[in-house]
C-alpha cells in the first residue's frame, strides 16, 4: 500500500492547498481544484495510506479540507487516513 504524508501547514493556505494536494496525491491534470473535486479524487484513489500532520494553526481552510478527507475515508475502503 502506498503511503503519503501531508504537511498540515500546507493544507491551511487557500491559495496553494489544491496545488499541493494535486502534486502529492498525483491527481489528474483535470482536477478541479475545489472541495468537490477533492472528494471525487479521494474516493477514486487506489489503496493508499494518507497521514495528515496537524498544522501549527488550525484554520478554517484546514478544517474544510480535513472534513473532505474524513468523508472520503468513510466512503473509499482503499483509503486509510491517519491524523497526527
Question: What is each model feature region?
Answer:
Residues 1-84:
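Positively charged, polar, low-complexity stretches
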